Swiss-Prot record:
Modified residues annotated as 4-aspartylphosphate in this record: D696
Enzyme nomenclature, EC number: 2.7.13.3
Binding site for Cu cation: C88, H92
Membrane-spanning parts: 49-69, 77-97, 113-133
Domain of life (superkingdom): Eukaryota
Name the UniProt record assigns to this protein: Ethylene receptor 4
Pfam families (alphabetical): ETR1_N (PF25487), GAF (PF01590), Response_reg (PF00072)
Residues found modified as Phosphohistidine: H390
PANTHER family: ETHYLENE RECEPTOR 4, TWO-COMPONENT SENSOR HISTIDINE KINASE
Cofactor binding notes: Binds 1 copper ion per dimer.
Taxonomic lineage: Eukaryota, Viridiplantae, Streptophyta, Embryophyta, Tracheophyta
């Protein structure tokens, strides 16, 4: 190429010189011919510049691609080619400059050198092409191989993505089955088989489960086969028709492994799974855990249950037998099987929760029925208790009223022992009435009153009652009092008297006088903190025993003869008293009602007995506050109401008679009425004959009573000439005590009631209330 260029350049120069010679030789030059030659020269110069620019740009491009790729194998050939290109470009560039300076010697020398170097470089490039072209061909072959491999990888990647999508779809279907209500284990297994068949293009799929009642057999419960006539799959529930032994080696191998196992096509499990289908290709199997929720007994210990598994058998089509099961396919099977296990576990848990909910609902119904029966029994018991208390309260109220008249006779003719007996009877009756009021009105809350009372009088009356009970039971009685006991103390005398009577009654019930002599002892003395305690269960108190406090020890004991103790120790002998108790029943003192009372009174109580069973005792220690100053017990004032005309309405004959006697004792002229209606009829017929009306009506005690005291009072105020009548009504003990909101006072004002007297009606209480009413009105 350089030689051709040189020849062209020399020819152009010769032509240019001859033309000039012709023009300068004499004669006129052809201006048109000179213009064409000049145009050609300009065209050659431009072409040389463009060719030079093109040649010089090629090495730059090669350098750029060399930085982007590894050209170590063709480095020599590339260098030769780059040198050849650069020299060719330089030759064309110098040739372009010769058109302007054709006779420049340096330019001609440079052009000659460039052409010589270009010739050498072209020769070297031609030689290097002998090795460059085969390498280039090998690179092309490798590129085609890589392209084919990339195509196969792309195709495999598409298959993997499709299978992953199918796996995701299978997981979503199983999740939907889990969220379905209610989930079914067989439905979950069917969904698993269908989704795996769709994802992997299976020829057949089978689900084996342990046979019910046959632990050594597996039953084919589901079988999925591909029908050749259409694209749909046929899912059959086989049932118990096809079985396989649980001790088969393939079955044992699958059961023992957590991952999928590839089986031989001629194995027993594979042959049994391809029932009714064409011969299959590669076979894989995996176990699916079936959760059995532990059943808990009453103690909370779980029952140990043996693990149970189902087997999922997957069969590929025969034309895929060469490929077999890939690791990715087995991973897909593992993922779907794990999801199926989760779904089965969820279904088992939900099934167990439903059964537990049903059992809990049944138990709740039973508990509600039991609660209803218990509430009915409680209401019945309360009704019976209230009826019994109401039935007992009226006789007790009558006794209290009669005893109040005996305590305040018109002439003081009673002997001291008679007065002591009457006071003891009055205290016992008041205690019984108060206890019944507590049972009816305030059964839960216990309160202790702290007010001054005569300790000597209480002890004398308690000893009197204890001696009377001992003599009635045929036992002896002995009491011992300390002279240093204070006269007046502050406390709840009713609670103390109740505790003492209970101690006496408990020991007397344990005394069998027919088997031998018994003697009851009663002792009261002051004790101190350092006194020896008789019960290990009792924790000593640490009160401050100053001059304002005193600690009193009450001890009631029972002593028996040797023959009585021996007879009581025989196991075959039963006590003859129906109320007798055993030694274990002595503990009732420390429980419930009495224990609360003792604690509220800052005291302690315990029982003790000797090893031979001859003697038993109950000890009570109470702390009292001493009453400061001298207290004078003045007898209550009994007024005399001269000829006060009173109408008494009471629906109980005994109470009516006692209240009438009390009113007559107060100097009243009394007419009685057995009911509220009779009272109203008497008032309507003789309006001006009565000055005061006493109402003691209780419709709860008498079911036939039509009206209570408040209703009768309202009817009385509705009468024409009854505005001047004074009305006093007798109410139960707890009505006024529990009236915190003033509802009873408001009801009395609305009904026109002038006074209230608390039951039981006694001579001092009724006299004081009548005096107050007469003074206020």
């Amino acid at each position: 190429m350089a030689m051709v260029t040189a020849r062209q350049f020399l020819a152009s120069a010769a032509e240019l010189g001859s033309g000039r010679r012709r023009c300068g030789g004499g004669g006129a030059c052809d201006m048109r011919e000179d213009g064409g030659v000049e145009a050609l020269m300009q065209c050659q110069r431009v072409s040389n510049l463009l060719i030079a620019a093109s040649f010089l740009s090629i090495p730059l491009e090669l350098f750029y691609f060399a930085t982007c790729a590894d050209l170590s194998e063709v480095k020599c050939a590339v260098l030769h080619f780059c040198a050849f290109i650069v020299l060719c470009g330089a030759t064309h560039l110098l040739a372009a400059f010769t058109h302007a300076h054709p006779h420049s010697a340096p330019l001609l020398r440079a052009l000659t050198a460039a052409k010589v170097l270009a010739a050498v470089a072209s020769s070297a490039a031609a030689v290097s092409l002998l090795t460059f072209i085969p390498k280039l061909l090998r690179i092309k072959v490798r590129e085609s191989l890589l392209r084919d491999k990339a195509s196969r990888l792309h195709r495999d990647l598409g298959l993997v993505r499709r299978r992953e999508e199918a796996t995701s779809r299978a997981v979503r279907e199983l999740t939907g089955r889990i969220r379905a209500s209610p989930p079914d284990a067989h439905a979950i297994l069917r969904t698993t088989a269908l989704q795996l068949a769709d994802a992997l293009g299976l020829h057949a799929c089978a689900v084996w489960m342990p046979a019910a009642g046959r632990p050594h057999d597996l039953v084919l419960v589901h079988h999925l086969t591909s029908r050749p006539d259409d694209a749909a799959d046929l899912l059959l529930e086989v049932g118990d028709a096809c079985t396989v032994a649980a001790d088969d080696p393939d079955v044992v191998d699958v059961m023992a492994s957590k991952v999928a196992k590839v089986l031989e096509p001629d194995s027993a499990l594979a042959m049994a799974s391809s029932v009714g289908a064409a011969p299959a290709g590669a076979v894989a199997a995996i176990r699916i855990p079936i959760l059995r929720v532990s059943i808990y007994d009453g103690g909370g210990t779980p029952e140990v249950t043996e693990a149970s598994y189902a087997i999922l058998v997957l069969l590929l089509p025969p034309h895929d037998a060469a490929g077999g099961w890939s690791s990715h396919d087995l991973e897909i099977v593992q993922v779907v099987a794990d999801q199926a296990a989760v779904a089965l576990s969820h279904a088992a848990v939900l099934e167990e929760s439903r059964s537990m909910r049903d059992r809990f609902a049944e138990q709740h119904r039973a508990l509600m029925q039991a609660k209803h029966r218990a509430a009915m029994a409680t209401r019945a018991f309360s009704s019976i208790q209230s009826a019994m208390c109401h039935a007992m309260r009226r006789p007790v109220h009558s006794i209290v009223g009669l005893v109040s008249m005996l305590q305040h006779p018109e002439a003081d003719t009673m002997r001291p022992e008679q007065r002591l007996a009457v006071d003891a009877i009055a205290r016992t009756s008041n205690l019984l009435s108060a206890l019944m009021d507590e049972v009816i009105v305030n059964r839960q809350h216990l309160s202790v009153q702290r007010k001054p009372f005569s300790l000597h009088a209480l002890i004398k009356e308690a000893i009197s009652v204890a001696g009377c009970l001992s003599h009635c039971g045929g036992a002896g009685f002995l009491h011992q009092l300390e002279c240093a006991l204070p006269e007046w103390v502050v406390g709840d005398e009713r609670r103390v008297f109740h505790l003492l009577l209970d101690m006496v009654g408990t020991l007397l019930n344990r005394c069998n006088t027919e088997s031998g002599a018994c003697r009851l002892s009663f002792s009261i003395r002051i004790c101190n903190v350092g006194e020896e305690r008789y019960s290990l269960d009792w924790i000593p108190m640490r009160p401050t025993f100053s001059g304002c406090n005193v600690c009193v020890k009450f001890k009631v004991g029972i002593g028996r003869s040797r023959s009585c103790a021996i007879e009581r120790s025989l196991p075959c002998e039963l006590p003859r008293r129906s109320a007798a108790t055993t030694s274990s029943q002595m503990g009732h003192i420390f429980s419930g009602y009495f224990n609360k009372i003792v604690q509220m009174m800052n005291g302690n109580m315990w029982s003790a007995s000797d090893s031979e069973g001859v003697g038993e005792s109950v000890t009570l220690i109470l702390q009292f506050k001493l009453q400061q100053g001298h207290v004078e017990a003045s007898p209550p004032y009994i007024p005399h109401l001269n000829g006060l005309r009173v109408l008494l309405a009471d629906d109980d004959a005994m109470n009516r008679g006692v209240t009438k006697k009390i009113l007559e004792r107060l100097g009243c002229q009394v007419m009685s009425a057995p009911s509220g209606a009779h009272c109203l009829s008497l008032l309507a017929s003789a309006e001006a004959s009565f000055q005061l009306v006493v109402l003691d009506l209780d419709d709860r005690a008498v079911p036939s009573a039509a009206m209570d005291g408040f209703e009768v009072a309202l009817r009385i105020r509705e009468l024409r000439y009854s505005c001047w009548l004074l009305i006093v009504i007798a109410v139960a003990a707890g009505v006024v005590a529990t009236d915190d909101g003033g509802a009873v006072q408001e009801l009395c004002q609305r009904a026109g009631i002038n006074g209230l007297v608390q039951k039981p009606v006694t001579l001092p209480a009724l006299g004081a209330q009548l005096c107050r009413v007469l003074q206020d009105n």
